[in-house]
From Swiss-Prot:
Residues forming coiled coils: 32-150
Cellular compartment(s): Cytoplasm, Cytoskeleton
Matches recorded under PANTHER family: KINESIN LIGHT CHAIN, KINESIN LIGHT CHAIN 4
Name of protein: Kinesin light chain 4
TPR repeat residue numbers: 55-88, 211-244, 253-286, 295-328, 337-370, 379-412, 464-497
Organism name: Homo sapiens (Human)
The encoding gene: KLC4
Gene3D superfamilies: Tetratricopeptide repeat domain
Length: 619
């Protein structure tokens, strides 16, 4: 028993052992019990040998047997202690495993709580986005309704394009006219969507009869916005041509041009440029590098680069197209002038104004020399050149060109410029002078000279753009009255162009208006003519014997009247506007009929537009 060492320590009262300390003590006790058992086994073995000896000698046998029994009891107690220690160690191991599992579960709970919080945050964010989306949808629905209404107005307010006969020359291509036929409202935007309906057989390679029907169908579907039909048609035809004729056939180049047109209308400029590059390679290899069809494809490719803002890359392509056309057609051909216009637009977007002026002036000389001064291209080129002058601050040169355009449009209708027939810009400047000298009552009213543009081509966007640009130039110069006159005239010309009956009858109406004027009742009478649906100002004819018209409206009232007139115009064109129950003194403020005699009343069968309401006699 002397070798038994128990690892017990005196602990202070109330001290609570930790789990590690208990395990350590248990292991120490177990080791002590193991040592004690070994010692007892050795003693018991010694006693057994002693008993055997005593049985032979017979001395002190009982005492030895008693010691053996005590040792066996001690061995049993030691075995019991060892079993309990092993149970405690196994229990401690199990508790440690349980605690480890408990920690794992706690970690999982923490992760689940974090995920739950993240999901809550995501749900809250999704709910906020859903709320914003619903608000945006509601706003878009309102905007859609508003745009539908504006679309109804625009349907009748679109600028009509003057139809011009196009020569069936082999120098044009189906995509050759990608630049605008009419000037854009924003002079800085020179490149715009072209006219895609030009027949492809007008290009450098004539479309075979077997492809013409397909080409017409594709153009029709593209014009209707049905690209989901037009694109598969083009691709199928392209595959058939490549299979039957080979990739390098000119028919394939033509079909590539048509498919590029459809892609361009979808604003897929990269795909369209890739197709045009393929078409260019085919045409250069089959038709030669100086063929007009190659020039047309180069021009189309330059336009696509321009639409993507790659003006530097587009300029050499356009320059090469110009060189080919000059070589094939001569330097004074109208198509050369058209290419010069396109090149000028590209240079203008790069700020190369000297080159822009040179190209426009040369194109203008070609148009005037080959097509005459009254050709619409002359006015368009002058308008473009004036826009270039405006960008450089050359306001005097721009003003001169704008006045030339308006004067030429006036001469085309009336044949000359005299005191009775003055261009609108002259009236605008006279009105400005009268405004400065405070003699409104003695001036010619806007309504009397505002009808000149009706007899001209009021649907021409060139004239309309010129009116607005010159009005903006006047406003920059501080000529507010003249600017207002031109702006009102431009606005009214657009609205007048919505009524086809008015367009065909206006010259006749103006002819009747020379002698028709309402006579005054007496010295004390006053008849007031208020603006009708499309009125721009209200005027009053004072019965003081002077026979002068006085302006009595304001610009704010004008805008309100114009806004109401647009709604009435849509209802009238849709056939839903109620007809007036009786004739009254109201009518359009243009006063085109003040000069008409009472003996020549308007016929009901004339089909008046919204801007020519019935006007009864003042008697």
């Amino acid at each position: 028993m002397s070798g038994l060492v128990l690892g017990q320590r005196d602990e202070p009262a109330g001290h609570r052992l930790s789990q590690e300390e208990i395990l350590g003590s248990t292991r120490l006790v177990s080791q002590g019990l193991e040592a004690l058992r070994s010692e007892h086994q050795a003693v018991l073995q010694s006693l057994s040998q002693t008993i055997e000896c005593l049985q032979q000698g017979g001395h002190e046998e009982g005492l030895v047997h008693e010691k053996a029994r005590q040792l066996r009891r001690s061995m049993e107690n030691i075995e019991l202690g060892l079993s309990e220690a092993q149970v405690m160690l196994a229990l401690a191991s199990h508790l440690s495993t349980v605690e480890s599992e408990k920690q794992k579960l706690r970690a999982q709970v923490r992760r689940l709580c974090q995920e739950n919080q993240w999901l809550r945050d995501e749900l809250a964010g999704t709910q906020q986005r859903l709320q914003r989306s619903e608000q945006a949808v509601a706003q878009l629905e309102e905007e859609k309704k508003h745009l539908e209404f504006l679309g109804q107005l625009r349907q009748y307010d679109e600028d009509g394009h003057t139809s011009e006969e196009k020569e069936g020359d082999a120098t044009k291509d189906s995509l050759d006219d990608l630049f605008p036929n009419e000037e854009e409202e924003d002079p800085s935007n020179g490149l715009s969507r072209g006219q895609g309906a030009t027949a492809a057989q007008q290009g450098g390679y004539e479309i075979p009869a077997r492809l013409r029907t397909l080409h017409n169908l594709v153009i029709q579907y593209a014009a209707q916005g049905r690209y989901e039909v037009a694109v598969p048609l083009c691709k199928q035809a392209l595959e058939d041509l490549e299979r039957t004729s080979g990739r390098g056939h000119p028919d394939v180049a033509t079909m590539l041009n048509i498919l590029a047109l459809v892609y361009r209308d979808q604003n897929k400029y990269k795909e369209a440029a890739h197709l045009l590059n393929d078409a260019l390679s085919i045409r250069e290899s089959t038709l030669g590098p100086d063929h007009p069809a190659v020039a047309a494809t180069l021009n189309n490719l330059a336009v696509l680069y321009g639409k993507r803002g790659k003006y530097k890359e587009a300029e050499p392509l356009c320059q090469r197209a110009l060189e080919i056309r000059e070589k094939v057609l001569g330097t004074n051909h109208p198509d050369v002038a058209k290419q010069l216009n396109n090149l000028a637009l590209l240079c203008q977007n790069q700020g190369k104004y000297e080159a822009v002026e040179r190209y426009y002036q040369r194109a203008l000389a070609i148009y005037e020399g080959q097509l005459g001064p009254d050709n619409p291209n002359v006015a368009r080129t002058k308008n473009n050149l004036a826009s270039c002058y405006l960008k450089q601050g050359k306001y005097a040169e721009a003003e001169t060109l704008y006045k030339e355009i308006l004067t030429r449009a006036h001469v085309q209708e009336f044949g000359s410029v005299d005191d009775d027939h003055k261009p609108i810009w002259m009236h605008a400047e006279e009105r400005e002078e009268m405004s400065k000298s405070r003699h409104h009552e003695g001036g010619t009213p806007y309504a009397e000279y505002g009808g000149w543009y009706k007899a001209c081509k009021v649907s021409s966007p060139t004239v309309n753009t010129t009116l607005r640009n010159l009005g903006a130039l006047y406003r920059r110069q501080g000529k507010l009255e003249a600017a207002e006159t031109l702006e009102e005239c431009a606005l009214r010309s657009r609205r007048q162009g919505t009524d086809p009956i008015s367009q065909t009858k206006v010259a006749e109406l103006l002819g009747e208006s020379d002698g028709r004027r309402t006579s005054q009742e007496g010295p004390g009478d006053s008849v007031k003519f208020e603006g009708g649906e499309d009125a721009s100002v209200a005027v009053e004819w004072s019965g003081d014997g002077s026979g002068t018209l006085q302006r009595s409206g304001s610009l704010g009232k004008i805008r309100d009247v114009l806004r109401r007139s647009s709604e009435l115009l849509v209802r009238k064109l849709q056939g839903t506007e109620p007809r007036p129950s009786s004739s009254n003194m109201k009518r359009a403020a243009s006063l085109n009929y003040l000069n008409q005699p009472s003996a020549a009343p308007l016929q009901v069968s004339r089909g008046l537009s919204a801007s020519t309401m019935d006007l009864s006699s003042s008697s």
